[in-house]
């Protein structure tokens, strides 16, 4: 009986994935592409691109922000999906 109970607890923890936090690339300008662990409850990563006088700019991070017209936005829901 104890073995069955332990098995059920382990299966529950694995299936619910307690404590999983999303990992997104964060590229904010000239720093380069690194990763960040998103806050609990945040379920999306984003990549936004726009063109300015110096060329195409790319910004990445956690969340899915609102953008101005002319900015291309891609949001996704898996680790490192915004690369």
Curated annotation (Swiss-Prot):
GO terms for molecular function: acetylcholine receptor inhibitor activity; ion channel regulator activity; toxin activity. InterPro entries: Snake_3FTx, Snake_toxin-like_sf, Snake_toxin_con_site, Toxin_cobra-type. Its main location: secreted. The keyword Transcription does not apply. It comes from the Eukaryota. Gene3D superfamilies: CD59. Disulfide bonds join 24-45, 38-62, 64-75, 76-81. Keywords: Acetylcholine receptor inhibiting toxin, Disulfide bond, Ion channel impairing toxin, Neurotoxin, Postsynaptic neurotoxin, Secreted, Signal, Toxin. Transmembrane segments: none annotated. The keyword Disulfide bond applies. Expressed by the venom gland. It is found in: Secreted. One of its GO terms (cellular component) is extracellular region. Residues 1-21 form the signal peptide. Binds to muscle nicotinic acetylcholine receptor (nAChR) and inhibits acetylcholine from binding to the receptor, thereby impairing neuromuscular transmission. Belongs to the three-finger toxin family. Short-chain subfamily. Type I alpha-neurotoxin sub-subfamily. This is Three-finger toxin MALT0058C.
């Amino acid at each position: 009986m104890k073995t069955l109970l332990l098995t059920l607890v382990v299966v529950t923890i694995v299936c619910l994935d307690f404590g999983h936090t999303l990992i997104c690339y964060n590229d904010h300008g000239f720093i380069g592409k690194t990763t960040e662990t998103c806050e609990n409850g945040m379920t999306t990563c984003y990549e936004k691109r726009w063109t300015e006088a110096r060329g195409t700019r790319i910004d990445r991070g956690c969340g899915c922000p609102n953008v101005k017209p002319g900015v291309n936005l891609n949001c996704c829901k898996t680790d490192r999906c915004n690369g």
